[in-house]
Amino acid sequence: MTPSLVERLLETLGSKGVVYCHWKSNADLKEALAKGGELDLLVERKDAQLFESAVAALGFKRVVDLLHGRFASVFHFYGLDDNTCELVHLHVYYRMTTGESLLKNYSFPLEELFLRHSRLVEGVRLPPPAAELMLFVIRAMLKHASPVEYLLLRRRNRSGYEALRAELEYLLADDAAARCAELLAEWLPAVDRNLFYTCLEAIRKDAPFARRFWLALRLRGQLEAYKRSSSASALLQLASLLLRQALWRWQGRRSKQPASGGCVIAFVGPEATGKSTLVKETAGWLGKTFDVTSAHLGKPPSTWLTFLPNMALSVARKAVPFLRPRLAESGAPGQPNRRASLLYSLRAVILAWDRRALALRLRRKAVNGRIVICDRYPSAIVGAMDSARLKTPVERGRWRGLLGYLAKGENQLYRQIPPPDAVIQLTVPVEVAVQRNQERRQKDAAAFVVHRHTAVMVPTFPTARTVELNSNQPRSQTINSARQIIWDAL
């Protein structure tokens, strides 16, 4: 079997001589290595460029967190494991920046201790057990010094502190606690060792919160020299962060974006090729981590300018059936009558306006860092799927002049739509599409599906990176192929 992304990462770091260690949460390291997940790596600052070039060669991409800001010397990288098609998160530290969950308002001078005295365990460099225990107790107690941090800790572990205490018991193995006094004296001399051991026992025995809170305040006072910001500044930062966090959650957004910027990715193809399924799956997959928006460009919402006309046209088409054109992407033969041609042309212009408005909104989101996933995408190719519809009439006359004016206006609107950054063009044999259509809740006529596969052009975008994907394969295989294409495009 092909080595996992994490295995290749560890092998690469070792072969290139990058000085690093997995500096925290090592109680769950085996699970993280097996499933990918998140790795917390402390990397020596002089090796930063070497490390980043190594992970870039493995397909990792730098990501920024807009909500929590950019902590100095702390970065996020994400990579796609080819075996599982799941994301691997590297939380990379060039300084020991830690502390509370939200602010991480402390920077401890422990890099040398963790890196120079690390040991190799199952292919991963880990810090000395006593050093990891010492820092764990300090980090845990700092979370008790703030009511907000305490509530976050309680929310994440409603049954108490089982996970916290389980990690503590893991770190207490091999008599690591006995060496903490020596390490404190050498590396954090401001911390009283008796207070440290009292804090350790308070966590271990699940002391009442009032006692833990008081001990945490005392410890925090002794760590004043290691703060990144003053108490007043930290309070303002916390208030701002909580407000922004509430706003982003209300909007249903994630805070991480690719450092290289956002991207508009379009799924295009005939009927029953799996566009909607893949858009939904992709938005759900990337939306667990990134700021993602999805939209259907074939059926755009009305703008304030087109709301009433769209409503009026809908009523007219239902109330007066003979006004409907007999050839309106249905695949049925025949030509619309004069009045139907006018109604059809008006509807086409309004649809072009709405599609352009939606495409421009999505483009603005992408250039501001968001990943945009589109179900279909319009083009200026007349007659192509979900694209311009109207041809300029050859015949002359007042009536044809009006239709020609509408056609030119519609074509111009489509030319103003910016192309997507990447296109995934889905294909399946027509007989498979017909079969899939029959399995839908809302079925189209079989003739319509055949017509869309054989007689209607798929829009093309010369300036966009276009990849063809055959979706006539097992669902999981199609999804994994789409994920690899999308990750390469970001």
Model regions and ranges:
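P-loop (Walker A) phosphate-binding loop of NTP-binding proteins
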Residues: 269-270
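Conserved NTP-donor binding/palm subdomain of two-metal-ion nucleotidyltransferases/polymerases, i.e.
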Residues: 1-37, 43-263
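Conserved lysine of the Walker
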Residues: 275
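NTP-dependent small-molecule kinase module
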Residues: 209-211, 215-237, 430-490
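Short beta-strand-centered segment that lines the nucleotide-binding/catalytic pocket of NTP-utilizing
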Residues: 288-305
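A glycine- and Lys/Arg-enriched "phosphate-lid" helix/loop adjacent to the NTP-binding pocket
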Residues: 376-455
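Hydrophobic positions on the alpha1 helix immediately C-terminal to the Walker A/P-loop
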Residues: 278
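ATP-dependent small-molecule kinase phosphotransfer cores
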Residues: 300-398
